[in-house]
Design a protein with these regions (language model features):
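Histidine- and aromatic-rich segments of cupredoxin/plastocyanin-like copper-binding domains
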Residues: 107-120, 129, 173-175, 180, ...
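Asparagine-centered strand-capping/turn motif at beta-strand->loop junctions
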Residues: 88-92, 221-222, 368-372
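N-terminal secretory signal peptides
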Residues: 1-18, 26-32
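Short tyrosine-centred short linear motifs in exposed loops/low-complexity segments
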Residues: 81-82, 122, 130-136, 213-214, ...
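Extended terminal and domain-junction accessory segments
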Residues: 36, 41-53, 147-178, 248-375, ...
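N-terminal edge beta-strand
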Residues: 61-77, 196-207, 339-360
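Hydrophobic or amphipathic alpha-helical targeting/insertion segments
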Residues: 130-158
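Active/binding-pocket-proximal capping segment
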Residues: 235-247, 371-398, 430-434, 440-444
Length: 444
């Protein structure tokens, strides 16, 4: 039985207790050997070749490798302001589109709304403009019911100003539903006769090592397709620096825990404080139980400095709107938890009526009501949004592109319609067998 309440004291237990409702409540409140893609750079433009392909990864030490559909391994790293000339090839047996989550203002590259799914064996070329620095995520966008799960690939865009950290580490958390034969059930299918399995960067136990007093930037990504997850770094001061790729006013993570909706990202700073050999467990909670998935270890190297850095200032900004004047905002309602007027990706047609149309330069307020029986996750393409307070008299001090909404709950979000074009809206229920559903909106 999972206890509903606060996390257990680190001194009392190596575990922390959360229910599924705890995860959702916390989310609402807070809301490496690199393998590089083929790239050629010239005058701020970079040619990038990405292939959606069948791959295999070893999830169990003594078990068979698991087939996955991926864009390759390792982080994709570029600089803010670059324009990527992307060649996307589909080597999968089904149609696919490239979905890069969190990249605002790229309407010509928008999957489904602007670019149809690519047939097996075909190629497509388009541009991606990297307007913002931050942590993003790329994956093939498929219809549910595929024969293998998707293995996403982190996209890291660095800023033009240096950030005072000694290590910059990506931690991609993935959830698998493994059959006894080692194959994995993709989301959108009944996970019967399977075992939930979690990895960080493809490993069941992931270690990060750093000298004493080193400052680390840890970029946590929830690569699970359906589950809200909590990650806890025990006995560490965890400072949240960015959410969903956008800098936030730094704040301490409550009890050292982060709650991540499917596809969401949170960047934190931690200091490797303590003598050599000190170990800080990394725990993962899926709403049912907590399990250790890694640790941060203070290495035997000499301390990198006599004492840890003082608290960090905010990360350099991405020129997001300083204010949103909601008095003249366009207001729309969007129902979640129901398939009405939503489409599976394979059934989506750009000729379908948009969920809403907004005028460029005008603020937009969306009222989201979850009419389903379980939590539903909304992903807004093209623009980041603010989560509004209950009375629309303010907003949370961070930007989001992904939001989980509890059953029966209503949330309001607001954004400035900056980038003309057509963009997707996604919703997924937090159930492995639930389909991904999409609609679109336009900015004119």
């Amino acid at each position: 039985m999972v206890r509903i309440g606060r996390m257990a004291s680190p001194a009392a237990s190596p575990e922390f207790w959360l229910s599924r409702r705890d995860l959702m409540a916390a989310l609402g409140a807070a809301a490496l050997c690199p393998a590089w893609p083929a790239t050629v750079s010239a005058q701020g433009r970079t040619a990038v070749a990405l292939q959606a392909r069948i791959d295999r990864i070893a999830l169990r030490p003594d078990g068979p490798e698991t087939p996955v559909w991926s864009l390759g391994n390792g982080d994709l790293r570029f600089r803010r302001g670059e324009v990527l000339d992307v060649t996307f090839g589909n080597e999968l047996p089904v149609a696919a589109a490239l979905d890069c989550r969190g990249l605002d203002g790229n309407p010509a590259a928008e999957p489904l709304a602007s670019r149809a799914q690519l047939a097996a064996g075909a190629k497509d070329t388009f541009q991606l403009r990297l307007r913002h620095a931050g942590t993003f995520l790329c994956e093939p966008l498929l219809g549910d019911g595929s024969t293998a799960p998707v293995h996403p690939r982190p996209l890291i865009v660095t800023g033009t100003s240096p950030v005072a950290v000694d290590r910059d580490e990506v931690l991609l958390i993935e959830e698998w539903r493994l059959r006894p034969d080692g194959t994995a059930i993709p989301p959108g299918n009944d996970p019967k006769e399977s075992t939930p399995f979690h990895t960080i960067n493809g490993k069941t136990s992931y270690e990060v090592s750093a000298p004493a007093n080193a400052r680390l930037r840890l970029r946590f990504i929830n690569g699970s397709q359906r589950s809200v997850l909590a990650v806890k770094l025990e006995n560490l001061d965890v400072r949240v620096m960015a959410i969903d790729g956008q800098p936030a006013e730094p704040f301490p993570a409550r009890n050292g825990a982060l709650v991540l909706a499917p596809g969401s990202r949170t960047d934190v700073f931690v200091d490797a404080a303590g003598p050599a050999g000190t170990s800080f467990p990394i725990l993962l909670h899926d709403g049912k139980q907590a399990r250790p998935v890694g640790r941060l270890i203070v290495s035997n190297e000499p301390p990198i400095r006599p004492a840890p850095f003082p608290p960090a200032p905010p990360l350099p900004g991405n020129d997001m709107p300083a204010q949103l004047d909601l008095r003249g905002a366009a207001r729309f309602e969007l129902a979640l938890g129901t398939p009405t007027e939503w489409f599976r990706p394979a059934d989506f047609k750009p000729s379908a009526a948009p969920a809403f149309q907004a005028k460029a330069g005008r603020p937009v307020v969306l009222t989201l009501t979850n009419r389903g029986a379980i939590a539903s996750v909304l992903r807004l393409h093209g623009h980041h949004f603010r989560l509004l307070d209950r009375l629309d008299d303010g907003w949370k001090p961070f930007w989001l592109d992904t939001l989980a909404v509890e059953p029966g709950q209503t949330q309001r979000i607001a954004f400035l319609a900056e980038y003309p074009g057509r963009y997707l809206i996604e919703q997924i229920a937090t159930d492995w067998a639930a389909p991904r559903l999409v609609r679109w909106y336009s900015v004119q």
